[in-house]
């Protein structure tokens, strides 16, 4: 009797899963597609600010674009965003960035971030979730000519572009990334 009831519950759960799973997967696909489209727009904005950045897009082994990073703080701060990862110009996955900071800081801002990977080893470290940026690593502001003088450090170079907001800070923190390959 107990086995029959368990079997009915299992069949019912599988039935419900069949009803809702396609909707969940579709929502994930739409979210992923939105991030990819936002990344394309962010790439265009970076190139508009600094046309010479085209050389980095062309010559790097890969790059990750985070089109919408939100940051806020009052003493302790945090930031986060999702992005698209490219290898040789082709989308290979998505990534999530999380940042925590501590120090004298207040406000909020939105910005874009792009990370260029000089070689396969640097991209592999990123995909293995082994790249973290500490307070000593800073992004280069994307403006005309900035990428011409940019140098890779440990196989990566980072650019950011402010989208809006005001942030006053003297803080230390770090960024951590989580990579997820496309399905």
Protein language model annotation of sequence segments:
Residues 1-2, 25:
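Generic cytosolic/nucleocytoplasmic N-terminal low-complexity/intrinsically disordered segments
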Residues 13-15, 25:
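Cleavable N-terminal signal peptides
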Residues 21-27:
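Sec/Tat signal peptide C-region and signal peptidase I cleavage site
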Residues 9, 22, 71-73:
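An N-terminal domain-start capping segment
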Residues 2-13:
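Bacterial N-terminal signal peptides that target proteins for export
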Residues 28-183:
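Small-residue-enriched, tightly packed secondary-structure blocks
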């Amino acid at each position: 009797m107990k086995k029959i009831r368990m079997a009915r519950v299992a069949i019912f759960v599988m039935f419900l899963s069949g009803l809702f799973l396609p909707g969940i997967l579709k929502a994930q696909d739409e979210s992923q597609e939105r991030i990819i489209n936002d990344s394309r727009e962010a790439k265009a904005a970076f190139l508009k600010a600094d046309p010479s950045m085209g050389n980095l897009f062309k010559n790097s082994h890969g790059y990750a674009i985070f089109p919408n990073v939100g940051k806020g703080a009052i003493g302790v701060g945090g930031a986060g965003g999702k992005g698209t990862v490219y290898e040789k110009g082709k989308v290979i996955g998505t990534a999530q960035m999380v940042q925590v900071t501590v120090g004298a800081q207040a406000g909020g801002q939105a910005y874009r971030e792009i990370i260029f990977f000089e070689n396969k080893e640097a991209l592999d470290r990123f995909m293995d979730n082994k790249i973290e940026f500490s307070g000593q690593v800073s992004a280069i502001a994307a403006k005309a000519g900035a990428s011409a003088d940019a140098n890779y450090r440990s196989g990566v170079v980072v650019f950011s572009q402010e989208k809006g907001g005001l942030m006053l800070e003297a803080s230390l923190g770090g960024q951590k990334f989580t990579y997820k390959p496309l399905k």
